[in-house]
Amino acid sequence: MSESRSGTSAPTVLRMILGRRLQDMRLAADASLEDAAKALRVTPLTIRRLEKAEVALKPLYVEKLLETFGADRQEIDEFVDLAEQANEPGWWHSYRDAVPSWFTAYVSLETGAQTLRTYEPQYVTGLLQTHDYARAVLRGGLPNGSEEELARRVELRLRRQSLLEREDAPTLWVVMEEAVLHRTVDSPEVMREQIERLLDVSELPHVSLDVVSFDAGAHAGACAPFTYFRFAEPELPDIVYSEILSASVYLDQRVDVVAHLEAHSRMALLTSSEDSRALLNRMRKEYS
């Protein structure tokens, strides 16, 4: 997979749902990729890309495909309405001037997820960062960027955090390394404020925060940071996003997703919420 709300309205997520449903309709009608391509006068590869949500689905395409598959008028109208919603830009599209296109897909998945799990070996996860911490981290990754671009990226990062305040907020389970707390980002004052933020959010009923201490030794998480997404919609697969210095990847093959889930669970077993809060409180005092 190359790209990739607990309600359904994030455009990329809607496109994925629509693609999966169209594929199911095609298979139920015993129609081949070639049959569908002929109806739209496109190539079979284009149909495959439509079903995989790699390109936008025009409402007219949806209508013609469903007519080919023998759908009734009510089904056609419902699918066309879904296609129109999927083509509406999300709020994050207004930040396309400040972030790469692949990241807008990430925000769509994050906004649409019912469950989020993250592993962070170096920095506090973006959803829990304070303004000053986020600014320092983003500045480090944008050495030649303008102040305006930096400000836009910080604004986007903080706006993403509003999903934790929604009535239908997703559950968030963060596993992070103790090293994150020892890496002084910007200043002791910034770190103290950041740790206080972590202590506050760890009390939210839908947020779990586990800090793996140095005492845990070598463990399954000695790897790159990753985020796991699970959606309420049964059509959607679980997805893992992982990144390295110069690249990022979205994984939806079951074997890859399970490997990351198991690693996350094993790391969480190395600590507890109580131990994590105690460690956070100790580190807060060290930065005082």
Residue ranges and their predicted role:
Residues E34, P44-L45:
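Key DNA-contact positions within bacterial/archaeal DNA-binding proteins
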Residues S2-R20, D24, A28, L33-K38, ...:
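Interdomain hinge/linker segments and adjacent boundary elements that couple functional modules
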Residues V175, V185-S288:
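C-terminal regulatory/effector modules of DNA-binding transcriptional regulators
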Residues R48-L50:
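Short amphipathic helix-turn modules centered on a small-residue break
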